[in-house]
Amino acid sequence: MMTYQEIFNEIKNKAYFKNHRHVLIAVSGGVDSMNLLHFLYLFQDKLKIRIGIAHVNHKQRSESDSEEAYLKCWAKKHDIPIYVSNFEGIFSEKAARDWRYAFFKSIMLKNNYSALVTAHHSDDQAETILMRLIRGSRLRHLSGIKSVQPFANGQLIRPFLTFSKKDLPEIFHFEDSSNRELSFLRNRVRNNYLPLLKQENPRFIQGLNQLALENSLLFQAFKELTNHITTTDLTEFNEQSKSIQYFLLQDYLEGFPDLDLKKSQFTQLLQIIQIAKQGYYYLKKDYYIFIDKFSFKITKIVPKTELVKEEKMLEYDSNLCYRDYYFSFMPKSNEDQGQVNIPLFSLSSIKLRSRQSGDYISFGHFSKKIRRLFIDEKFTIAERQNAIVGEQDGEIIFVLVGDKTYLRKACKHDIMLAKLYIDKLEKG
């Protein structure tokens, strides 16, 4: 067992709170969080911080309300702000955790706290690693809990992570009877599995934590060795070995934590990228992968209503801006080689719109579906999405796509009545 002074001596050089002045402490009332509360209260002047307390009453035990009342009384006595939330809904470990962290985040944002501090220690770290092993987690997820990570508008800090539970002083706290319920995996790991494994190896917890540390260093080294590679560049990606591609893609997917692909889905995704066939491929949870001839990216699916681009009607002898172009019936005074001009054989209004299913354009002796035109000419999906179709009298007279313009072939007896001029708008 250590004293608070000894704990302070060990963590002061880690400068956890160097960039923070107001920190929020997650306090359940258990021995770990009560130690954290007392420690930070005693050393807040030396750490140059001011603290607040955040407590969630899960309403699952008869003692919950008395624990909340005690913490409110303690906070009032010590002139510390306290924020309390009552859990609502169907209770589960995940639902409770999501509720807590959503509450902590909201308090930080509303009250200008730049850090959330929790009382996780090395025993919690070992439990987490063993739970992930049991669940069959990927190698990169065996890195365990980080002592500092981004959270809300600041950071989540775990200053006790290098200490074990037995290092913490004895202090008044509340015993949570639900910690003995074996219906929860963490409780089975803590109360059943770890004690048995420690009989085989008394240093089993230290071994799990060392595994987490080495695993974290391994992926840090991989990131440093591959940071010159643009993962989403298909040429660069496919120049790498299969093993490097595997971990590059895993690293890229870390940017989409709620995507949560199963191992079989990850394998399918990797194969899609390796084949590099252009198109959209649905993944899950409203995500899809978008592949063109140069690159790939993962993004949220856009609702169909948002994919319908705004249409505009261009009347003869008028002008308008549509997307990145300026349409008019008057040429520029100076000869602009970048200006597109389209012969018109009718003075009817022209509808400017996106491509629609079934669209085709006549090239004289033959017609071609615009979809097939895009494929044959190898336009990227982004270029296809931004293509502009000009329709007059129910017939497509031009297609503006990428840096090319395709015109309807005029009939033999058509008489040109005017010209439509198109200029690319300069982006400021």
Curated annotation (Swiss-Prot):
Keyword Transcription regulation annotated: no
UniProt-listed CDD domains: TilS_N
Subcellular location: Cytoplasm
A GO term for molecular function: tRNA(Ile)-lysidine synthase activity
Pfam family, one: ATP_bind_3
Gene3D superfamilies recorded: HUPs
Class of this enzyme: ligase
GO cellular component, as recorded: cytoplasm
Keywords tagged on the record: ATP-binding, Cytoplasm, Ligase, Nucleotide-binding, tRNA processing
Entry-linked InterPro entries: Lysidine-tRNA-synth_C, Rossmann-like_a/b/a_fold, TilS/TtcA_N, tRNA_Ile_lys_synt, tRNA_Ile_lys_synt_N
Main location: cytoplasm
EC number: 6.3.4.19
Residues the entry annotates as binding ATP: S28, G29, G30, V31, D32, S33
Gene Ontology biological process terms from the UniProt entry: tRNA modification
Catalytic reaction list: cytidine(34) in tRNA(Ile2) + L-lysine + ATP = lysidine(34) in tRNA(Ile2) + AMP + diphosphate + H(+)
Role: Ligates lysine onto the cytidine present at position 34 of the AUA codon-specific tRNA(Ile) that contains the anticodon CAU, in an ATP-dependent manner. Cytidine is converted to lysidine, thus changing the amino acid specificity of the tRNA from methionine to isoleucine.
Family assignment from sequence similarity: Belongs to the tRNA(Ile)-lysidine synthase family.
PANTHER family: TRNA(ILE)-LYSIDINE SYNTHASE-RELATED (PTHR43033:SF1)
Notes concerning its domains: The N-terminal region contains the highly conserved SGGXDS motif, predicted to be a P-loop motif involved in ATP binding.
Protein name: tRNA(Ile)-lysidine synthase
Organism: Streptococcus pyogenes serotype M6 (strain ATCC BAA-946 / MGAS10394)
